[in-house]
UniProtKB/Swiss-Prot annotation:
Source lineage: Bacteria, Bacillati, Bacillota, Bacilli, Bacillales
Annotated ranges, domain MaoC-like: 102-169
Name listed for the protein in its UniProt record: Transcription factor FapR
HAMAP family found in the cross-reference section: Transcrip_fact_FapR
Source organism of the structure: Geobacillus sp. (strain WCH70)
Family matches, as InterPro entries: HotDog_dom_sf, Transcription_factor_FapR, WH-like_DNA-bd_sf, WH_DNA-bd_sf
Amino acid sequence: MRKSKRERQRLLQETIQENPFITDEELAEKFSVSVQTIRLDRLELSIPELRERIKHVAQQSLADKVRSLPIEEVIGEIIDIEPDHSAISIFDVKSEHVFKRNRIARGHHLFAQANSLAVAVINDELALTAKANIRFTRQVKENERVVAKAKVVGEKENGRTIVEVNSYVGQELVFSGTFEMYRSNREKKDGDSNENSN
């Protein structure tokens, strides 16, 4: 038996709240309506499409892991992070990121993606870049996707954490950098190293 539009929309909302990863096709089958009807219902209820729902759930999860800066201040979109070990972000180069005359990305956007990822990977309330050694290895053009990969590689005697960031378009390296990071809270790390040395 077909449900009224109001009843279907109420159930649709409940179903998506229970399982934000359900597709429009699965919803259409569940409610015996067309995919287009589901899309119209979602629009009326201001429920985003599956991709946006997945992104929202992932960002909420990542926001809990990133302590050093608000997730919305990260340049690019963090897709994976293991605090004090590694992180990955993606950055889609759009028209506002390139020089108008040649459609090449401005370098400060690539640096900002790498630098903010180096900050985000630090598991501390405050992390600042003390020093950076960077290299641009090829031009990045409009509509290319830059994948930045950060890895914590060590710690200096002065307590600063060393983070290496390599950025790629496809398999091609386009940017590399070594970031020396100041962090405000050294007690935990110092305690860990003392335990390991005993």
